[in-house]
């Protein structure tokens, strides 16, 4: 075809001949191309028109007008036939028999075949018909098949896709919300619980991953089915208006096969089970757990109250020890002074000093008792508040560990 096109091309405009005219030298050119050359020759000549020369061989021709040149009807007809052949679709060939055109339609297998397939191949005993009859029959079949496929399970697939995406979104929202609760709860605990907090948050992330692993494959399957369905629609839209029988039958075969594959693909379920933890998670269930037993618990156990109380007798004993300590500190000094002096004046001085010591000691003890009472009162208040706060934290953490079997 390329070599033929070279012979049908005008040397001047390099396009297919348009109204070809033959010169006396037998060279062919388009009429418009010759008119352009002749017009330029006349314009450049001031006195008389110069002789017209062939653009190929430069042989002179009398410039009596282009219309006087003979039309090459043979070349013009060849160009017209070439244009028709170039525009018409190329005849498809058989894949099994090289170079054989697909010019027969097998009604048994509903596909295009060649003559060898019909006489010596696997279609020997099948029923055949002409391309025109097959085109008319398949054209009617296409309309009904297209209408039935247009609404085939598309609504069901879209509904299931929406259900799965909604379920996935809600599940992830629940897990995210629960994860935030755990983060807020563990932020109030001591640093010794950080490792346990990270383990629990890791469990939530694992559950998120499990949800995504459960939902994503099904969602991807539905997206693939819908994408295949859209591709089938695009194929149908592309060739439903095709009037060429061969091209239509070939496209119809591909369309039927794609529809068959789509219909045979099962739709995944839309009611995947959710984890019970996503529905029943509540941090209030941690309130009865003991923090002291966090590292020991693996199953829920009876909850109780952690009691830490300092008896009042301890404070009485502390005061007695303090008084005895004062006597021990000041007693040896007074005893030494008594043993060193024998006269009465010395004893009187010692007694006077002892009396002074007793007075100072009594004042000191009185002030010590007063400040100690203030300290113990403040300590009792702080102890009660700290005890209540500690009990709440201990019970909550122990309940959480028992419930979720973290150990």
Swiss-Prot record:
SMART domains: BBOX, RING. Zn(2+) binds at residues 94, 97, 117, 123. One of its GO terms (biological process) is proteasome-mediated ubiquitin-dependent protein catabolic process. A zinc finger (B box-type) spans 89-131. Pathway: Protein modification; protein ubiquitination. One of its GO terms (molecular function) is ubiquitin-protein transferase activity. It is a single-pass membrane protein. Auto-ubiquitinated; requires the RING-type zinc finger. Auto-polyubiquitination leads to proteasomal degradation. The keyword Ubl conjugation applies. It catalyses: S-ubiquitinyl-[E2 ubiquitin-conjugating enzyme]-L-cysteine + [acceptor protein]-L-lysine = [E2 ubiquitin-conjugating enzyme]-L-cysteine + N(6)-ubiquitinyl-[acceptor protein]-L-lysine. Its main location: endoplasmic reticulum. Its EC number is 2.3.2.27. It is an enzyme of class 2 (transferase). Keywords: Coiled coil, Endoplasmic reticulum, Immunity, Innate immunity, Membrane, Metal-binding, Transferase, Transmembrane, Transmembrane helix, Ubl conjugation, Ubl conjugation pathway, Zinc, Zinc-finger. Belongs to the TRIM/RBCC family. Located on chromosome 13 within the minimal deletion region for B-cell chronic lymphocytic leukemia. Endoplasmic reticulum (ER) membrane anchored E3 ligase involved in the retrotranslocation and turnover of membrane and secretory proteins from the ER through a set of processes named ER-associated degradation (ERAD). This process acts on misfolded proteins as well as in the regulated degradation of correctly folded proteins. Enhances ionizing radiation-induced p53/TP53 stability and apoptosis via ubiquitinating MDM2 and AKT1 and decreasing AKT1 kinase activity through MDM2 and AKT1 proteasomal degradation. Regulates ER stress-induced autophagy, and may act as a tumor suppressor. Interacts (via C-terminal domain) with VCP. Interacts with AKT1; the interaction ubiquitinates AKT1 and leads to its proteasomal degradation. Interacts with MDM2; the interaction ubiquitinates AKT1 and leads to its proteasomal degradation. Interacts with p62/SQSTM1. Interacts with TRAF6. Interacts with IKBKG/NEMO. This is E3 ubiquitin-protein ligase TRIM13. It comes from Homo sapiens (Human). The gene is TRIM13.
């Amino acid at each position: 075809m390329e070599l033929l096109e070279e012979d049908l091309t005008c040397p001047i405009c390099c396009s297919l001949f348009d109204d070809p005219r033959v010169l006396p030298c037998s060279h062919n050119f388009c009429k418009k191309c010759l008119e352009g050359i002749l017009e330029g020759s006349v314009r450049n000549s001031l006195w008389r028109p110069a002789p017209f020369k062939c653009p190929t061989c430069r042989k002179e021709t009398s410039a009596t007008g282009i219309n006087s040149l003979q039309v090459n009807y043979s070349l013009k007809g060849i160009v017209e036939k070439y244009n028709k052949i170039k525009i018409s679709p190329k005849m498809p060939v058989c894949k099994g028999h090289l170079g054989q055109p697909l010019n027969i339609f097998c009604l048994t297998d509903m596909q295009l075949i060649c003559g060898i397939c019909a006489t010596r191949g696997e279609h020997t005993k099948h029923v055949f018909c002409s391309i025109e009859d097959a085109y008319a029959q398949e054209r009617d079949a296409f309309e009904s098949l297209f209408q039935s496929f247009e609404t085939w399970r598309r609504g069901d697939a879209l509904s299931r896709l929406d259900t799965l995406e909604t379920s996935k979104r809600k599940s992830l929202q629940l897990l995210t919300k629960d994860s935030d609760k755990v983060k807020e709860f563990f932020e109030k605990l001591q640093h010794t619980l950080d490792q346990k907090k990270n383990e629990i948050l890791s469990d939530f992330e694992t559950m998120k991953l499990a949800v995504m692993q459960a939902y994503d494959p099904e969602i991807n399957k539905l997206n693939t089915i819908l994408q295949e369905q859209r591709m089938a629609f695009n194929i149908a839209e592309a060739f439903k208006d095709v009037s060429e029988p061969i091209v239509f039958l070939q496209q119809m075969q591909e369309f039927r096969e794609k529809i068959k594959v789509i219909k045979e693909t099962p739709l995944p379920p839309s009611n995947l089970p959710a984890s019970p933890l996503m529905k029943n998670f509540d941090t209030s269930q941690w309130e009865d757990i003991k923090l002291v037993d966090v590292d020991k618990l693996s199953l829920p156990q009876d909850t109780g109250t952690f009691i830490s109380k300092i008896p009042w007798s301890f404070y009485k004993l502390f005061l007695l020890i303090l008084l005895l300590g004062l006597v021990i500190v000041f007693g040896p000094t007074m005893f030494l002074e008594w043993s060193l002096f024998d006269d009465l004046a010395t004893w009187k001085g010692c007694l006077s000093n002892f009396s002074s010591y007793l007075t100072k000691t009594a004042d000191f003890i009185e002030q010590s008792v007063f400040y100690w009472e203030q300290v113990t009162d403040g300590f009792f208040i702080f102890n009660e508040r700290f005890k209540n706060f500690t009990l709440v934290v201990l019970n909550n953490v122990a309940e959480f560990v028992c419930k979720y079997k973290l150990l």
